[in-house]
Amino acid sequence: MSDIEIARAATKKPIQQIGATLGIGADDLLPYGHDKAKVSQSFITSVQDRPNGKLILVTAINPTPAGEGKTTTTVGLGDGLNRIGKKACVCIREASLGPNFGMKGGAAGGGHAQVIPMEDMNLHFTGDFHAITSAHSLLSAMIDNHIYWGNELEIDIRRVTWRRVVDMNDRALRQITASLGGVANGFPREAGFDITVASEVMAILCLARDLKDLEQRLGDMIVAYRRDRSPVYCRDIKAEGAMTVLLKDAMQPNLVQTLENNPAFVHGGPFANIAHGCNSVIATTTALKLADFVVTEAGFGADLGAEKFMNIKCRKAGLAPDCVVLVATVRAMKMNGGVAKADLGAENVAAVQAGCANLGRHIGNLQGFGVPVVVAINHFVTDTEAEIQAVKDYVAGQGAEAILSRHWELGSEGSAALATRVAEIAESGASQFSPLYPDAMPLLEKIETIAKRIYHAEKVIADNKIVDQLKLWEEQGYGHLPICMAKTQYSFSTDPNERGAPTGHAIPVREVRLSAGAGFVVVVCGEIMTMPGLPRVPSAEHIRLNDAGEVEGLF
């Protein structure tokens, strides 16, 4: 059966029953239909003094066209922990509309390790992304309105940095001219659109602790500069209060369920390159108060998502992972070993061994954070015993252990062995987590630390303009902020075609951006796309309603 057929065949429980497994009463759930609900802010506040459960991060090797199955493993591990008698909850991100109608498929997991209701989660869900788009757009409108009515703040209209957003892949909107059509429409200027998940509002929603913190962070956003290059903040436009009103419901995490009726929080969805690529702090911290084990994931490979989880999310939220699960597949090892995608079905132990260097690099990087690492081999039907053993032997040589997991095929039955070992490690107290760099380290040195320790680069190339900008931000009081690297997810270098574990390369910094509200400095390496385009044949062409009123073609 396909993923959607498996999801539709599942027996869903009313969301009130799912909430009850975590101790959330019906009065503290704000239902959206029968199978999804938001958890009230008052309930979240009421559990803040409880002790935390164990935090498990699921990450992966650099993504390949063969697919690694990170979300599938996250869901499968959560179900597996519940199967062996642990009270566990899954925390993942929401899906963006744009990619769902572009490249084929949304989905949250796959096979027998999915979160449902699948269609809702990949379409409008509970309206969080619409609220974020609306709040962002309100600020855009208020900036141009301020300029129209006299520009008291003396905004330099050539230096308005706040772009507009829409939750769609639309390359035609990347660079536009706004306010054409005469005096009544304002002052013409260059502008552009990003996709909603690239918005700083999204990053802020996912890092804010509560509504008060949200409003403070929104006010801190830099939206433009004056002629003297001094910043204009969102609070100068007086937009943060109304934006908070638009976001008050979106701040409440969404509760749904897995195919095996276990609880899952699905909340927030920032880009893993331009932002930090993790689900919301409020969902993760709430889950930790309600469950003994919380399984969460971070976007793309461990060099991007896990690094940001450790250095941004954990630092901001005071979190510390008890175990990291690194997802790898035999197919991906073969691809890293030089096998073409069409030939991945044939046994090739030598290619598996050759392709393990990328896996080894990630293991070493993660161990550098002081956290125990378990490799989950996400099983595919074409994997042979010899190939699986080759991965296990390699991982053992790296001071870690690899466990085969068959959750896609068998659900929690297939992930029970992985869950048992992860639980043992998490409960052992072996984790000695520490971030990669201290707050007090200068910004450029933080960038160099990530480049050398995580990417194994020889040097960072940054011109005087960038170095001076970083020094200026330090003088303005932003030197304590963590770094958010924006680079290709496909390689440790900035060349997406450079597979494996390259060393000795340089990391060129093209641009630096201050996300003062979110609280990090974005370092752009190479080309970064904040508004994707649709492919030649977008998946939207194949999406329709069938005669039964069911969605077809979405996954």
From Swiss-Prot:
Its EC number is 6.3.4.3. Pfam families: FTHFS. PROSITE patterns: FTHFS_1, FTHFS_2. Pathway: One-carbon metabolism; tetrahydrofolate interconversion. InterPro entries: Formate_THF_ligase, Formate_THF_ligase_CS, P-loop_NTPase. One of its GO terms (biological process) is tetrahydrofolate interconversion. It catalyses: (6S)-5,6,7,8-tetrahydrofolate + formate + ATP = (6R)-10-formyltetrahydrofolate + ADP + phosphate. Disulfide bonds: none annotated. SUPFAM superfamilies: P-loop containing nucleoside triphosphate hydrolases. It is an enzyme of class 6 (ligase). It comes from the Bacteria. Keywords: ATP-binding, Ligase, Nucleotide-binding, One-carbon metabolism. GO terms for molecular function: ATP binding; formate-tetrahydrofolate ligase activity. ATP binds at T64, P65, A66, G67, E68, G69, K70, T71. Belongs to the formate--tetrahydrofolate ligase family. This is Formate--tetrahydrofolate ligase. It comes from Dinoroseobacter shibae (strain DSM 16493 / NCIMB 14021 / DFL 12). The lineage of its organism: Bacteria, Pseudomonadati, Pseudomonadota, Alphaproteobacteria, Rhodobacterales. The gene is fhs.
